[in-house]
Amino acid sequence: MGKGVGRDKYEPAAVSEHGDKKGKKAKKERDMDELKKEVSMDDHKLSLDELHRKYGTDLSRGLTTARAAEILARDGPNALTPPPTTPEWVKFCRQLFGGFSMLLWIGAILCFLAYGILAATEEDFDNDNLYLGVVLAAVVIITGCFSYYQEAKSSKIMESFKNMVPQQALVIRNGEKMSINAEDVVVGDLVEVKGGDRIPADLRIISANGCKVDNSSLTGESEPQTRSPDFTNENPLETRNIAFFSTNCVEGTARGIVIYTGDRTVMGRIATLASGLEGGQTPIAAEIEHFIHIITGVAVFLGVSFFILSLILEYTWLEAVIFLIGIIVANVPEGLLATVTVCLTLTAKRMARKNCLVKNLEAVETLGSTSTICSDKTGTLTQNRMTVAHMWFDNQIHEADTTENQSGVSFDKTSATWLALSRIAGLCNRAVFQANQENLPILKRAVAGDASESALLKCIELCCGSVKEMRERYTKIVEIPFNSTNKYQLSIHKNLNANEPRHLLVMKGAPERILDRCSSILLHGKEQPLDEELKDAFQNAYLELGGLGERVLGFCHLLLPDEQFPEGFQFDTDEVNFPVDNLCFIGLISMIDPPRAAVPDAVGKCRSAGIKVIMVTGDHPITAKAIAKGVGIISEGNETVEDIAARLNIPVSQVNPRDAKACVVHGSDLKDMTSEQLDDILKYHTEIVFARTSPQQKLIIVEGCQRQGAIVAVTGDGVNDSPALKKADIGVAMGIAGSDVSKQAADMILLDDNFASIVTGVEEGRLIFDNLKKSIAYTLTSNIPEITPFLIFIIANIPLPLGTVTILCIDLGTDMVPAISLAYEQAESDIMKRQPRNPKTDKLVNERLISMAYGQIGMIQALGGFFTYFVILAENGFLPFHLLGIRVDWDDRWINDVEDSYGQQWTYEQRKIVEFTCHTAFFVSIVVVQWADLVICKTRRNSVFQQGMKNKILIFGLFEETALAAFLSYCPGMGVALRMYPLKPTWWFCAFPYSLLIFVYDEIRKLIIRRRPGGWVEKETYY
């Protein structure tokens, strides 16, 4: 392989200047597919000579400075390209002109148009349309600013990719060590790293000394991984001789040659993949779009029909255009945009109190319609701390307490064997508590040391008191640290116990290796020879604990005889001058990262809510399956193919996969699957665990679920999860353990890292969907009594019953608080017991909702308004039949002798005062019938009497709208400002019977729905 090969396939192909858009798009898709493939490299297989040939690097002196400068010029700096961010002004414009706002803008423009037409054609005209246009524009701008502020506040996007690049790196060039900027590291550089450093680029290790790296941000595995020059695995992500860019070196030192830099590193590929993925449209955005189509359709249909009708009725063109505009504007629910924004914001605030931080307001609802959750294991389902789970000593398994608050079972701590075991676990252990934590509970203390050793340290500290004092009593003389060839750790301590020899040798390590070094075993404090029977007992215990997905360690000791090893003996760990065989076996201790306490309950809730929970983890299949069973992702009694094969004692290949409800898929099998095979697994198995998966596979799993039509939520904390988080319908990152990159890709952040918070989120999301429906039903209903006066005015030629300004007073005044108050309504029934909604069929606004709001309740409201209108005119001398066809004379300011039914003559001024009084009364009637509408909108199925009136905001809303209506009617000066006049108290009561009718009508309808579920009434009217 020549230099530079293997790099070329990531270089962007040259696109000709006039290369069309399609070419670019296809290329982008090709690049994305390339990134989704597994990491392929062969540097880990090359010998040192081949490496030297491939990169032209002297393995002791490094590159020359000149050569390094050439490569830097060719490849560019070793940095990740930051993801493309949307400029703030674009985000702001989206809020101002997106979706619903567009409808209001069109309304405002039409108003200005109508005002312009009137101003040009008549000397004397009113300014209603001008006011209306200004108010509409103001509504859009104010709600736009509000949504923008809300989103900007919750998504202060972290500059996370910048923080990931280590600032300095130690390279060897021209045979000299020099510290340079990490951005200047080039392919072929010889780099040195030590404990505490971040790895500056992808390295092929050529020499190492006790080096361990923490790959958790990349693979999700919490255990530090050993790094050495040995080629140990075909898979570059698993082999020991490659260290990855931006992972941390925890201990030891290593030297390596840089094989990839910047965007070409494994981490860089993941980052590019995440920033290149398109997140789709959120379900609620799609719903609102669908709703706008409906409303616009209705408005335009009515407008055009009446435009044609008014021409047939011999109105002039100009009048007809004014009518058209009037009808379209009356149809637009001006207050709805604000209502939806406020409802989503309230829910986002409520979720923040429950530890869910929502970055994108629309994501609030998406979580409610989720049908599949792909959850990471470590830290989300589990506590993300290794904990001692079981011990095996005195030939039986003892259970330790793994609960977060130590409320579980404990075991017999009096046995002499346990004392010996705890002594080894405390002494043969390099973990220490960090300083100044004496006041913290033991489990909460920070530990310096690897995960398994800290688990042992905390366990012994809890059971046996201070480990520090134990270590002071038994001073350490020498130790052999754990290494991958012997697989044990050993130390020798001074022993001050009078009845024991002066030196104590303790050892721990891989159980089978430890057992091989033992010839006796301690049972109930007495040493016995290790026979076959006891070896079998050990083997069974080891298999049982391993089968629980636990990490098992074996412990043994030896009391060194004083005659051979007197006081002051010089122990030598290089030329070993003390026994490491024929030791005495004490017992096993097994550890696991235990499930969080609230998770099994949360998984159960998901199941009853019809949500499928899939575990996707980088961990071992056995551990993954054990945790899945522990939290209920694989429920009791459900078997995998392997379980069935074991039970029937037949080979796995003979089991029909469809007989197994549960399924554990290994990453290496997933690699060779076609998308059809993956679809089959997702379709036919209800309980699925994917283990040993790579970041790219997470993404493939998410896409597979989406092909099934599922709305997918993904949880994750590592950088490795960011592509899947971005692709999912809703990405959920972890607030505590999460890397910045994953937080940036996500839509929502769990502040307490707890899976149970997701379930709370689902509940809130479902509730907001229900409540938005109610809010919209309430808001839309008053559209009918707002439009019909205009239509009757055109058809029957009567004085206008309701003016434009009064319509605005309803939409932006009296209806606002009640509509928002419905967002505080509690759930009617257990919303977590029903299936997730199907986004294709179960819409936010459907035909049934429109038919209820417009066709039924709205019509009753309109009747109430007209009744009041006719009563007032009749009291003033104009009987209903006398009004037909009177409009032309009525609106003519030069006619001052219009006669009423009793022959009285009315001047223009007097007529207009009566007309505006009618407007005010019609407005008040709408408020009165909206009382009933608000109360019936509280529930969709239950009776209002079942639901109760616990919603204080709603009760306030009722009083607020009434007070506002009274204020507008009786406040002095309103006659000039809004042309609203005081009403006789009796006129308030005209609409009461209609209000009562609405309430009774709807209660009967809901009663029928409850009595006959699935019947005709439910099919036609349940929205």
Curated annotation (Swiss-Prot):
Molecular function, one GO term: ATPase binding
List of residues that carry Phosphoserine: S16, S40, S47, S228, S452, S484, S668, S675, S943
Keyword Transmembrane belongs to the record: yes
Residue ranges of the TM segments: 88-108, 132-152, 289-308, 321-338, 773-792, 803-823, 844-866, 919-938, 952-970, 986-1006
Keyword terms of this UniProt record: Acetylation, ATP-binding, Cell membrane, Cell projection, Ion transport, Magnesium, Membrane, Metal-binding, Nucleotide-binding, Phosphoprotein, Potassium, Potassium transport, Sodium, Sodium transport, Sodium/potassium transport, Translocase, Transmembrane, Transmembrane helix, Transport
Catalytic activity reported: K(+)(out) + Na(+)(in) + ATP + H2O = K(+)(in) + Na(+)(out) + ADP + phosphate + H(+)
Active site per UniProt: D376 (4-aspartylphosphate intermediate)
EC primary class: translocase
Known function: This is the catalytic component of the active enzyme, which catalyzes the hydrolysis of ATP coupled with the exchange of sodium and potassium ions across the plasma membrane. This action creates the electrochemical gradient of sodium and potassium ions, providing the energy for active transport of various nutrients. Could also be part of an osmosensory signaling pathway that senses body-fluid sodium levels and controls salt intake behavior as well as voluntary water intake to regulate sodium homeostasis.
Name the record gives this protein: Sodium/potassium-transporting ATPase subunit alpha-1
Organism whose genome encodes this protein: Oryctolagus cuniculus (Rabbit)
Encoding gene, per UniProt annotation: ATP1A1
